[in-house]
A protein has these predicted regions:
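Short alpha-helical segment
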Residues: 45-51
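C-terminal output helix
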Residues: 116-125
């Protein structure tokens, strides 16, 4: 039973940036289809900067815990420069306390362990998107 509910303005689409291998993109798209989320897929870290330059706005960024070389820091930097900054979900084969606390310290939202079920992915994306909306709403009221 899917209990994920997005609490966002019905006039605004929920957008997700997903840095995932090409062979997994179809599965992610299917797992998120019932949420009505618009997903922009990239398969290489360098492609994230191209999207950032276009000033695309995302509720959530789905990033792998491991990237070759220093790609992870570069991607994190690009994501951090997006305004507003999306909530970052990091996926990994295992979630250690060190990884989870490191992600939170860097300003990420959460870590999800793969392989994840449709329900697990939907729940994580929903919570992150709702957190994004709440944070942006608070920021708007603080101005």
């Amino acid at each position: 039973m899917n209990t994920a509910h997005l609490h966002v303005d019905k006039n605004r689409e929920v957008r997700l940036l997903a840095l995932v291998p090409v062979d997994v993109q179809g599965q992610i798209r299917r797992q998120l289809a019932s949420l009505g989320v618009t997903v922009d897929f990239v398969s290489k870290a360098a492609e994230v900067s191209q999207l950032a330059l276009r000033r695309n706005s995302y509720h959530v960024a789905l990033l792998p815990a491991v990237l070759p070389d220093n790609g992870w820091w570069s991607v994190w930097g690009e994501i951090a420069l997006l305004n507003p900054r999306p909530e970052v979900l990091v996926y990994a084969h295992s979630a250690t306390f060190k990884l989870w606390s490191g992600v939170l310290e860097m300003g990420g939202y959460d870590v999800i362990v793969e392989p994840f079920t449709e329900e697990e992915l939907q729940r994580a994306v929903t919570r992150a998107a709702n957190s994004f909306v709440e944070r942006c709403s608070r920021d708007d009221h603080d101005e």
